[in-house]
């Protein structure tokens, strides 16, 4: 058990992380960096995973692909990818190619860094991104992508003070964050990542890095150490509570004092119906996306009873403010899933936020579930994301209230004649 400031205790258990493969990051990163191509060195399993997870047909020519490892490749010293790289350049004309690792070639001890350097040119760099599920939670693969981009961020001179938002968000959310910062008088240096490879932000000793995703601690530390940038330690901008604190703390970094309590109250007022439904509900968060801490904090402040908040990894410094806001909540790192099953059966929570792997079994036992993956894909940041965030939590509760109980005959009527 670990103690963090504010008398919050983190219970450390012994489980491997039940999570999507890190290759899933391709789904949002290739859409964000619009002149990129993501190449995965993997197996047929990787191909089936991406085909099903991303729902992209091959004739759509998406800006990602898989170089398949066959049985014959197991005896080779290193895979040969020159022809594939040439084909990618001819078909897609990318400005950068990300070479992602997967489990099998990592077990084979493929030298990915050497391979990427060999394939890289000045015109089209090939950047290695460790993304296999052997090491990282799937959202941390975005951290690895940003890690690879750091050398391509210009060095900002001393005295050039502005904010760089850290984390991939869609263009509409990026516009909202930029507009809000400028309205508060905060100079904006850009986003990491930007939508084009040649537009990555300049980062230097007077840059303030504002993480907007809670799973980017490694790249934040790298920029802090290598560029001398200052990392904003605050709540993440999810929900009225987190958004107010985030913007007030960020403004303070620039010597600007703002009081956004009225705006926070107005945001809570907009989701009164949702919070009324959440109030008093027992919510259980299993480890998956590493977004669990800020989501649990929002639920707690919305009046729900968070019976457990578990996460794959917790960084006591990077997540310090979120942990302080969770006083009184059971917080577990790398939870033992078998223990969680027993606790869920005993506690009978009203809502479980869980992974795609465990959602259907929980639903089959009569629990109301929400896929944690959905919080990754929806625009839930800052003031504009308050209503979408609240709706994500209440939609399964509203749906269940309109459905008959699982033991009613309506569920098998006309489906299995032998069961009638």
Swiss-Prot record:
It is an enzyme of class 1 (oxidoreductase). Its EC number is 1.3.7.7. Pathway: Porphyrin-containing compound metabolism; bacteriochlorophyll biosynthesis (light-independent). Binds 1 [4Fe-4S] cluster per heterodimer. The cluster is bound at the heterodimer interface by residues from both subunits. InterPro entries: LIPOR_BchN/ChlN, Nase/OxRdtase_comp1, Protochl_reductN. It comes from the Bacteria. It catalyses: chlorophyllide a + oxidized 2[4Fe-4S]-[ferredoxin] + 2 ADP + 2 phosphate = protochlorophyllide a + reduced 2[4Fe-4S]-[ferredoxin] + 2 ATP + 2 H2O. HAMAP family: ChlN_BchN. This is Light-independent protochlorophyllide reductase subunit N. It comes from Chlorobium phaeobacteroides (strain DSM 266 / SMG 266 / 2430).
């Amino acid at each position: 058990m670990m103690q963090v400031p504010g008398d919050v205790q983190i219970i450390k258990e012994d489980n491997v992380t039940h999570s999507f493969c890190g290759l899933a990051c391709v789904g949002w990163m290739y859409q964000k960096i619009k002149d990129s191509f993501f190449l995965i060195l993997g197996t047929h399993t990787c191909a089936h995973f991406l085909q099903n997870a991303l729902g992209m047909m091959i004739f759509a020519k998406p800006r990602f692909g898989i170089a398949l490892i066959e049985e014959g490749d197991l005896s080779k010293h290193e895979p040969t990818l020159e022809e594939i790289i040439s084909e990618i350049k001819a078909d897609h004309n990318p400005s950068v190619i990300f070479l992602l690792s997967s489990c099998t070639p990592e077990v084979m001890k493929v030298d990915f860094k050497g391979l990427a350097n060999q394939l890289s040119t000045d015109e089209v760099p090939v950047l290695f991104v460790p993304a296999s599920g052997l090491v990282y939670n799937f959202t941390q693969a975005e951290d690895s992508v940003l890690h690879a981009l750091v050398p391509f961020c210009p060095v900002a001179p001393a005295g050039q003070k502005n904010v760089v938002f850290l984390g991939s968000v869609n263009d509409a959310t990026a516009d909202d964050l930029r507009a809000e910062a400028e309205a508060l008088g905060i100079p904006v240096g850009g986003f990491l990542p930007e939508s084009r490879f040649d537009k990555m932000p300049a980062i230097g000793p007077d840059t303030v890095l504002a993480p907007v995703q809670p799973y980017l601690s490694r790249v934040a530390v790298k920029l802090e150490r290598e560029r001398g940038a200052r990392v904003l330690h605050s709540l993440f901008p999810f929900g009225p509570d987190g958004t107010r604190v985030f913007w007030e703390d960020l403004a303070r970094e620039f010597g600007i004092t703002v009081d956004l309590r009225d705006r926070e109250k107005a945001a809570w007022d907009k989701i009164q119906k949702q919070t009324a439904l959440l109030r008093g509900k027992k919510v259980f968060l299993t480890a998956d996306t590493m977004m669990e801490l800020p989501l649990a904090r929002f639920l707690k402040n919305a009046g729900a009873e968070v019976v457990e908040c578990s996460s794959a990894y917790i960084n006591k410094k990077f997540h310090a403010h979120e942990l302080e806001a969770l006083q009184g909540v059971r917080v577990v790192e790398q939870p033992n899933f078998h223990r969680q099953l027993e606790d869920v059966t005993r506690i009978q929570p009203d809502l479980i936020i869980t992974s795609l792997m465990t959602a259907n079994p929980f639903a089959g036992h009569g629990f109301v579930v929400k896929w944690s993956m959905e919080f990754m894909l929806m625009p839930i940041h800052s003031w504009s994301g308050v209503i979408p965030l609240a709706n994500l939590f209440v939609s399964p509760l509203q749906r269940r209230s309109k459905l008959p109980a699982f033991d009613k005959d309506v569920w098998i009527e006309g489906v299995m004649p032998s069961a009638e």
